[in-house]
Curated annotation (Swiss-Prot):
Entry keyword Zinc: no
Cross-referenced InterPro entries: Aro_prenylTrfase, Aro_prenylTrfase_DMATS, DMATS-type_fun
One of the protein's GO biological processes: alkaloid metabolic process
Class of this enzyme: transferase
EC annotation from Swiss-Prot or TrEMBL: 2.5.1.-
Keywords of this entry: Transferase
Keyword Transferase attributed: yes
PANTHER family, sorted: INDOLE PRENYLTRANSFERASE TDIB-RELATED (PTHR40627), PRENYLTRANSFERASE ASQH1-RELATED (PTHR40627:SF4)
Pfam families: Trp_DMAT
Family recorded in the similarity comment: Belongs to the tryptophan dimethylallyltransferase family.
Pathways involved: Mycotoxin biosynthesis
Protein name: Prenyltransferase fsdK
Organism, scientific name: Fusarium heterosporum
Length: 452
């Protein structure tokens, strides 16, 4: 199958062509973002098998509700807040949750809302636009409940803005000049049945906390609304055994009633051994076949998935760190393809803590930025893995989608980080829930992002 570029602007989806013809121009910045991300979102939705009605719904949602939140265009002198969501500083991400044997793919948007006050003394952490955005969404989406959201916005942040501005950058989070760790993100999941589910993400910032908020302060915040939870206790016990290996970085929560909302507690690590991936997925042996009847096979499948997307040999030792891709060049900066400090540039993980659960669900994120050879290799690896498990219905569409996202004249073999992460969650029925996260600014061999 050809992996050559097929620009979305040369071959747009039918839904995009129709909307582009009839939706009016609004302003320089709004038109910039709509023309920048609209064709890409349209292509991903089309290739994921969404009905034409669902494509229109998701694209009109993008046009009316998301695009106005993205701030000044990247070309504007007013563009001062560089989001870490993308290497070029844009604040929008797409992801593709792979089909299972009985369900089609699902597409998700993630956005970091930005306005003219982002990063100023009025809003040094850029937290206000996201909260306003959530309340606007609550006016059109049924069943949104922001109780958890307001709780975390109050308990995970201090509010002396002048002090926060002094402490936050660049030393505070050790990020390259110009990039800022976001404080809050909003995820929008477009289900194939037409529903839209939202999640809120929080990266805490308290006075004098150092680089990241300690585990105990995360735990204290969660316990205020959910005092007793076995799954959370299991997570704290696991991560406390080796606090140097897992760094708590973020919380996310479903925007729904506290009694049913799940909390996702995110950690990052510098480690990448295959054995470490298995240790994380079993919570150090706390998750067993009692909780996941197909656990042993799922662990084997996870190792095969990691090998497939990174290109390491089938006999690669389980207790050795993954090798850097040949293109990785430390002289280009600590982050190399979307800047991240070394201590959190290995696996990432979230523990999905549901009310009343005994153990959490665990999702592992495999980073492509350091360990994958190029996007063609990642695409070949993940599609081969899916085909070997009988999940080949959307392989052709996935590959076409990737090629269509590329800048004109580019091929998947010459770019990196179009696929930024591949994640894996074990389902109770034995399946692996696998998601690909898509970069809107893949990198060439010059280590510079290319806006698409």
């Amino acid at each position: 199958m050809s992996l050559n570029s097929a620009s979305t602007r040369e071959h747009p989806s039918e839904a995009w062509k129709s909307l582009a013809q009839y939706l009016p121009s609004r302003s320089t910045d709004l038109d910039y973002w709509w023309q920048r991300i609209g064709p890409s979102a349209a292509l991903v939705l089309e290739k994921a098998g969404y009905s034409i009605k669902s494509q229109y719904d998701a694209l009109l949602f993008l046009y009316h509700w998301v695009v106005p939140e993205l701030g000044p265009s990247l070309l504007s002198t007013d563009h001062k807040w560089k989001s870490l969501l993308q290497g070029d500083g844009s604040a929008f991400e797409l992801s593709w949750k792979w089909n299972t044997n009985d369900s089609p793919p699902e597409v998700r948007y993630v956005v970091e809302p930005i306005n003219q006050f982002s990063g100023t003394l009025l809003d040094p952490l850029n937290s206000q636009p996201s909260m306003v955005f959530r309340h606007r969404l609550a006016s059109i989406l049924p069943n949104i409940d922001l109780t958890w959201c307001h709780h975390f916005a109050g308990s995970l942040f201090d509010h002396n803005k002048a002090r926060l501005l002094r402490e936050m950058m660049p030393e505070g989070h050790k990020m390259p000049a110009g990039y800022t760790v976001p404080s809050t993100l909003v995820a929008l999941e477009f289900l194939q049945d037409g529903q839209v589910a939202t999640k809120s993400y929080f990266i805490p910032r308290k006075h004098g906390q150092g680089v990241w908020l300690p585990i105990a302060q995360f735990e204290e915040s969660i316990a205020e609304l959910d005092p007793v939870n076995e799954a959370r206790a299991a997570v704290v016990d696991f991560v406390s055994k080796d606090p140097e290996s897992l760094t708590p970085i973020m919380l996310a929560v479903d925007d729904k009633d506290v009694s049913s909302a799940r909390i996702k507690w995110y950690f990052a690590t510098a480690r990448t051994e295959l054995s470490w991936a298995k240790e994380i997925m079993t919570l150090g042996g706390r998750i067993t076949t009692k909780h996941l009847p197909h656990l042993e096979q799922q662990l084997d499948d996870l190792i095969e998935l990691i090998k497939a997307v990174t290109g390491i040999a089938s006999e690669y030792p389980q207790d050795v760190e993954l090798p850097f891709a040949p293109r990785f060049d430390p002289s280009k900066g600590a982050g190399n393809f979307v800047p991240l400090p070394i201590p959190i540039a290995g696996y990432q993980v979230h523990f999905n803590i549901a009310p009343g659960s005994e153990v959490p669900g665990v999702k592992l994120y495999i980073p492509m930025r350091r360990y994958a050879r190029d996007d063609a290799s990642v695409a070949k690896g993940i599609t081969s893995f899916m085909e070997s498990r009988g999940r080949n219905t959307y392989i052709k569409e996935y590959t076409e989608m990737l090629a269509g996202l590329l800048p004109d004249g580019k091929e998947l073999s010459s770019v990196h980080c179009l696929q930024t992460y591949v994640s894996c969650l074990f389902k109770k029925n034995g399946e692996l829930e696998i998601t690909t996260y898509l970069g809107m600014a893949p990198y060439g061999d010059n280590h510079k992002p290319m806006s698409i």
